[in-house]
Amino acid sequence: MTGITDFDALRRAMAENSEEPEGPARNARAEQLLAEAEKLDIPLAVIEALGHQLKVYNYSSEKDKMFVPFARLLRMWDERPEDFDEYEIHSLHWVFKWMSSGMLGQPHIPLASIEKWLAEMEHRYRLAGHSERAVRSAEFSVASHVGDLARADRAYTAWLAADRDTMADCHACELHSQGAWQVERGRDAEALDLWGPVLEGEFTCAHEPHTVLASSLAPLLRLGRADEARAHHLRGFRLVRPMESMRGAYADHVEFCALSGNEARGLELLAERPAYFTDSGNPRSGLEFLSVVTLLMDRLTELGLGDQRVPGPAGRPWTARELAAHARVEALALAARFDERNGTTRVGDRARARMDQRPLVERLPLGVRSAGRPTTAPVTEPTPGPAPEKDLSALLAEARRLSDTLQPHAVEAWLAVARAAEGVELAALDRAEIADHQAMDRGPEGIALFERAAELYAEAGDPGEAWAARARGAYVRALTGEVDEALAAIAEPYDGVLALYAEGATGVRQAAGVLMSRARVLMRGVHEDPSGDSPDGEVLAAAEAAVREVLALVDGHTGDDVRLAARGAEGQAMLAELALRGGDAETAVRLFAKASTAFVGAGLPWFAVEYEARLAGLAHQLGDIAETERALRAALEHGGPYLEAPGRAQLHLQLAEVLGGRGRAQEAAEHALEAAHWSDEAGEGPTLGAWARHQLGGFLLRQGRWAEAAEVLESALPDLSAETHGDGAVVQTKWWLGDCLSELGEHRAAAERRLQAAEIARHWPEQHDHATLAHLAAESLGHAGLHTEADQAYTRAGDLWRSLGNVHGLVRSLRARAWLALRADLADLGLDGARELMSAAIEECEAALLVTDDEETRQRLTGELGHTHRQFGELLARSVAEEAEDTAIQGAFEDALTQTAEAVAVFAALGEGAVHTRTAAELAAGWLEADLSRPADAAARARGVLKAYEGADDGDETVRARRAEAEQLLQLMEEQTDK
């Protein structure tokens, strides 16, 4: 480490250390700087170094170290107050508050010492002339901590009644504490109202809204405001994650995961902060953390995952059950130390209540990448005795009811019958039905069982159902690819059932069953036709004839029989498929809709899902977006609880994309969130889930929800790949993420993402995206203070814009480089370089105008030229410091006025469409005239602006602003003239 040689160097070093991440490394550096300060033999240097050390300790996991530097500072103040400057006097009194709250968090410090310190703080604040607001706030903290609610209420009232002065906590911190008290008293809604200004960004500080976002999570869940809770978690955790000192807020996020069915994410959070299990510098936050660890581990154990490996204290592996026991013991031991010190049970009672909470939401989807909810293995608990099983006759009756009405769980009901019937002598019909449904459950392996079912049906005296069972076996054979064999196999059942039906020896249901199986076999032939998109006409005709035969048979019978109604609906869907194969998409849409309506009308909406989904795809192809949206919504509604996770994810994702395309980003985000959740549930998180998160991030970004979008997009990136999702999706995700990070002020990270995206786009045939990303990366690099890298990126972007013939992009890159050269004072550019770059930008505009005939293009180029002159003028005006010689200032302002006047002339040529840009330039020129001591010319420009807005709508904000500025300039110039 280079030694500190003077006070200024010490101050620079402390400022640099303040920007480092919280933690032991920053604390160690502060200790080194104090040692260096003591070598300077300057009392104020030591005072400032002690203050710096105290601050970094306070904002770290080593809060217990801050009492020593404060005691030394206080002794120095008492002995030689003249060594303190005004700022350090203020700082000394400010950190009295840190001491009182810090003492509360250390159970080894006696309560009497804390009360004595509180009295000392009140005395010193009174001597210094400060309000009692901070003192009453500190008293409230002590009273509420020990559980003296009456005193806490009195102190709370006095705190709010006292005047705010320079010693009061910032608005954000005060509101957090006040809201936390409302939560403590069971008033969640009132707390959230108090926190509103912090959550909305009206009041902020170094640790707010971080803590308010964390504290709001459980209240929001309790109030049923789950969407807000999700948003606060995503936004807040991003703020808390890099702040080592915020273990308490971090614990709130772990608690949220345990209470909202996000146990897997809770484990991920624990894994990120292993030191939080053992950091001992702040016992109070340690208790909070261990309490929620217990809550989470108990929840996992309750879910049957007690033996699952989990993150825990270093040095040994942990299971959820082991960590639950360990964390509970440690937490209660800490709580006992606090209660012993306080003489109450307050801390222990609160810790137990927190550990024993029940989940508030079964499962709240977050949208971020997740391993999925851990697979549960329910804990076996002793029961009073075996539950009485239904008798076989009841099981048979239930299975027949379900299958007769085509309910979703009919096959499972028949399997239950089969298990119960083992070793029981049954009638042939019962055995036939059992075999029939077992065959349905087994797929290709059940073909032989269909034959056995047919034999049993025949034995039971139902030849029609026997033919139907054989027909079902033939269809299953077709599903295996043996279409010709299936057609041959179904010929005999077809002829046989029709003969029986003609004789009145079987019913329409059995006949329809055989005819539908035959139609299904022929439809398999259509699907497997090697001619593909141009299917053989005979194949189509045969299938259509078979379908129409089914429809003719069931016509007139569907009202009384759900099964026959289903045959008719399926027949309409088959005709839709055939129409589509024949190239008639409009007819297919109509027939799919007819099929869906028929299924819903028959009380079988779950069968309509497939056809609404098909209809949605066709409607989208035909450009009917409204019908696409309707069909997707209908599919989700009709599927209800019977939709499997993969299908549900697909439908939500498709609907999200449709809604996003219609500009409804908020609703689109809701469906993309559901798509991400169900993709994870289906085990498709890395594929479909990544795409859903990509879309969700984009929709959140559109709403300006930058932090949430950034969390989601960052979580999507590890799974997105060019091979699976396309490199366009990877680039777009990085692009969006860069935009979010830029809005959040994380400019270095934004530049990194934009450069990564640009590197991929560099290999694309079309280079517009590459140029745009290079330009955006340059902006981020500039904001991050990486000026040389920013200039290089702007140069790269400019070359790309030139190669694309995009004059606007080229000109903007040149202007950006000019500003960068001036502001950053780049060694190889400086003011002369900035002038050259602005001049080059003007030349590019003028050259493009010479070769452009298209009027719209000329208008845009002329506007770009005007903006370039305007910026050139502004750059020149800012190029001289206030302390420069008068001649230098005069020369710079004259040059600036020349460029600004050019801008006015260029904008004037564009007519009324550019009136606002022209008047802005006119006023800028007027102020330059004023600075050059030309009041008459400045006044003339002001009058010109007022004239331009004669009769203009005063409701227009720009009009009002221009008039106000022009009147201000005119008044000042007239006053100067009068003098």
Give the location of each predicted region.
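Residue at a conserved register position within TPR or TPR-like alpha-solenoid repeats
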Residues: N17, Y57, A143, Q182, ...
